[in-house]
Amino acid sequence: MDDIYKAAVEQLTEEQKNEFKAAFDIFVLGAEDGCISTKELGKVMRMLGQNPTPEELQEMIDEVDEDGSGTVDFDEFLVMMVRCMKDDSKGKSEEELSDLFRMFDKNADGYIDLEELKIMLQATGETITEDDIEELMKDGDKNNDGRIDYDEFLEFMKGVE
């Protein structure tokens, strides 16, 4: 693995790491070894708004799966996400972000409230405190109305690109 990508992982914000961890954990729920299979990897990356081609995905897998196990742990996954973010200089498309917003907006009212955010984060099986959830909400809720609208979500996601 390139040291440059490992160094870039260190530059990720806690919010970015939490978002990546939440997505990763959804697919690792049944795995005893804490790793996801390479075939699940594309699904996780698409969930996070990345859209690697099968060739790009295989290239990234070959790069991080040094032992040939066919699985990727969270640290390897972070390196892959940094690489994909770097390669995807345009960031997430409007359509991908819209899909992600709808995934969080369970009741389809056009807002992500604290409860919806909590449900999505707890679905990962990861231990996350109320304070962590409230901090994420505060970071995303720029007008302090207690919920994240689509424009706030887009602004928040710019920091993830």
Curated annotation (Swiss-Prot):
Pfam families: EF-hand_7 (PF13499), EF-hand_8 (PF13833)
Start and end residues of each EF-hand domain: 16-51, 52-87, 92-127, 128-161
SMART domains: EFh
Residues that bear N-acetylmethionine: M1
Binding residue positions for Ca(2+) 3: D141, N143, D145, R147, E152
GO cellular component: cardiac Troponin complex
Note: Cardiac muscle Tn-C can bind 3 calcium ions per molecule. Domain I does not bind calcium.
Entry protein name: Troponin C, slow skeletal and cardiac muscles
Species assigned in the record: Sus scrofa (Pig)
Protein's gene: TNNC1
